[in-house]
């Protein structure tokens, strides 16, 4: 059996053990095109042979930029890695300036794009990147070479021996990829991950995912340029799981069709799913509506392992049969695991989705740790709501004196590319300093409390952890995004982006004329209603932590407008700059 020590070993292992008819599947113009394990390997080898003919050498960097997950990305990935070259995945939504920076910083020699939209962005800065020899597109794009030309160039197998020799020369500790973190401040940093980093993380994370080997389907929609989904793609290959790719804005339609057993999620997505479900429940009438909200209330009290007693479990069984089964059917009916990561998951969502048997398991990790550090697992008592589970095997988690979480293990990055100073700041005595604050309970479960860098002191000298407040405020259906402010000021306050759709619906029911978004955010009744939500959230916090004032913003906070990173994290500095007038109003700065 193929021993897995390098990333390109995964498909060969899958071929020996499972030889799937459907290893990868992508929908093109309403038709599913499936790729077997054998085809996957054959095409990856064709890419390797072609890249050699195009002059690609060991340690060259090949950039891949795709608007959505698709089969071609994975074929390219293996084709590049087999040569000892590195795959540099780039978020499609970043600005042209960042494209130029990453392509130059990595010295990318070729760039593969998914479609015309991405091609136009690359084309606009191509002359600023002297190392870039050519650009190829997966879709047919006018005046752009197509990746099918590369596949055709690789049809001649006479240089396959050269590919095999290069493959054999790749060591587990060699650099596999540069992943540029979507920094909340400053330029992106290139995280250097080795084959061993990602292989170990996939193999250790696999132990936490209850999945039927060789006979299950996954739905992949989180960006594969992010290390979280990328590592899981390797894990799925190891499990013999068929991977179906879906656009992120059509998850429910694809899930109904594919009927996946496993998928990944981020809290923001789960929040939106929950809000949609509640909105549908609100539209019900009579007994149906009563039953629906009875089930939701029951779900919000959920504790695993029958901790609520037999009477609760009996009611839960009934709720699952009458209500929650319909929720499951909306995502295909087979879903048993949803791994949630990238940001803090509200405990109420963990409760209600697990009551509904979605198997939402929260984990914790960073790009620099390939990414998984810890994850919950329903089996063997390994699940505790409000925590990110226990550390995976071979991983040591240490809490520093100031509460910072420090990690040692085979998944810790090699360092930041071309940046020994920043590397030295975070890698100290073999431990990676995460910048997150947390604690480990008596049973070994890790709990994250805040970002070290995001905590601030008020002018009264009191520490405030903004994420805790933000997560509580976002439980309100009136609030879509929020940023807690107050560093060196007399009190904490908040900049709030209301949930415009929900508020307009609420206003209609209450016969309130709210007008445009600009008018809505200054409407007395809207402000008064959101003030009630803020007051309710404040009840959970100490006097000095409470949000004492807020302002509503008229724009929807987005990645494109610069409010958020591609992983939906707040760019605090930019949000503050955008709404400096509102900030100054709150604190009465002239």
Language model segments and positions:
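Conserved AMP-binding A3 loop
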Residues: 34-38, 176-202
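Conserved AMP-binding/adenylation subdomain of ANL enzymes
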Residues: 199-220, 224-324, 334
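Conserved ATP-binding/catalytic segment of the ANL
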Residues: 391-458, 475
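Conserved pre-ATP/AMP-binding loop-to-beta segment of ANL
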Residues: 20-22, 137, 155-180, 187, ...
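Structural core segment of the AMP-binding/adenylate-forming
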Residues: 82-153, 529
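Conserved C-terminal "lid"/linker of ANL adenylate-forming enzymes
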Residues: 456, 481-484, 531-590
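Conserved ANL (AMP-binding/adenylate-forming) active-site segment centered on the GW(Y/F)…HTG consensus within
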Residues: 314, 381, 385, 412-435, ...
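Conserved AMP-binding/adenylate-forming core of the ANL superfamily
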Residues: 24-55, 60-71, 76-78, 95-100, ...
């Amino acid at each position: 059996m193929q021993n897995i020590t390098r990333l390109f070993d995964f498909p060969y292992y899958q071929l020996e053990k499972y030889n799937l008819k459907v290893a990868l599947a992508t929908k093109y113009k309403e038709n599913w095109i499936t790729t077997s394990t054998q085809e996957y390997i054959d095409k990856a080898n064709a890419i390797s042979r072609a890249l050699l003919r195009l002059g690609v050498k060991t340690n060259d960097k090949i950039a891949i930029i795709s608007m959505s997950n698709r089969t071609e990305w994975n074929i390219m990935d293996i084709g590049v890695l087999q040569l000892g070259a590195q795959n540099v995945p780039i978020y499609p939504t970043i600005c042209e300036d960042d494209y130029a920076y990453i392509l130059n910083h990595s010295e990318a020699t070729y760039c593969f794009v998914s479609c015309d939209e991405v091609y136009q962005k690359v084309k606009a800065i191509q002359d600023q990147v002297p190392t870039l020899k050519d650009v190829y597109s997966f879709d047919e794009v006018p005046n752009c070479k197509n990746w099918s030309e590369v596949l055709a160039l690789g049809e001649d197998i006479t240089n396959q021996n050269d590919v095999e020799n290069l493959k054999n020369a790749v060591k587990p500790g060699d650099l596999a990829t540069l992943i540029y973190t979507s920094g909340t401040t400053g330029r992106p940093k290139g995280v250097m991950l080795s084959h061993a980093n990602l292989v170990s993380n996939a193999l250790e994370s696999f132990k936490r995912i209850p999945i039927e080997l060789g006979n299950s389907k996954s739905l992949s929609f989180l960006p594969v340029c992010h290390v979280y989904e990328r590592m899981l793609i390797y894990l799925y290959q190891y499990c013999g799981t068929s991977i179906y790719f879906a656009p992120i804005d059509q998850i429910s339609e694809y899930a109904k069709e594919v009927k996946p057993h496993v998928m990944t999620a981020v809290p923001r997505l789960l929040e939106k799913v929950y809000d949609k479900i509640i909105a549908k429940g609100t539209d019900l009438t009579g007994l149906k509506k009563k039953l629906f909200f009875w089930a939701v209330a029951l779900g919000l009290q959920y504790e695993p392992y029958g901790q609520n007693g037999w009477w609760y479990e009996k009611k839960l069984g009934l709720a699952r049969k009458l209500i929650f089964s319909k929720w499951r059917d909306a995502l295909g009916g087979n879903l048993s695991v949803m791994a949630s990561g990238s940001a803090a998951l509200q405990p109420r969502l963990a409760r209600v989705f697990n009551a509904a048997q979605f198997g939402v398991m929260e984990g914790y990790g960073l790009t620099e740790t390939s990414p998984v550090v810890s994850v919950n697992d329903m089996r063997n008592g390994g699940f505790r709501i409000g925590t990110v589970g226990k550390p995976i095997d071979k991983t040591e988690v240490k809490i520093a004196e100031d509460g910072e979480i420090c990690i040692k293990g085979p998944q810790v990055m090699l360092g930041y590319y071309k940046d020994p100073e920043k590397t030295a700041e975070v890698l100290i005595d073999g431990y990676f300093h995460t910048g997150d604050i947390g604690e480990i309970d008596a049973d070994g479960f890790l709990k994250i409390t805040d970002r070290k860098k995001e905590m601030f002191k008020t002018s009264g000298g009191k520490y405030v952890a903004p994420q805790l407040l933000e997560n509580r405020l976002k439980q309100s259906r009136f609030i879509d995004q929020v940023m807690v402010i107050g560093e060196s000021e007399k009190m904490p306050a908040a900049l709030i982006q209301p949930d415009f759709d929900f508020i307009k619906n609420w206003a209609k029911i209450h016969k309130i004329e709210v007008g445009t978004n600009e008018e809505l955010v200054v409407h007395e009744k809207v402000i008064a209603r959101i003030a009630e939500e803020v007051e309710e959230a404040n009840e959970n916090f100490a006097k000095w932590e409470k949000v004492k004032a807020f302002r509503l913003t008229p724009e929807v906070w987005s990645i494109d407008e610069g409010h958020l990173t591609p992983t939906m994290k707040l760019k605090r500095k930019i949000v503050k700059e955008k709404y400096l007038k509102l900030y100054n109003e709150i604190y009465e700065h002239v």
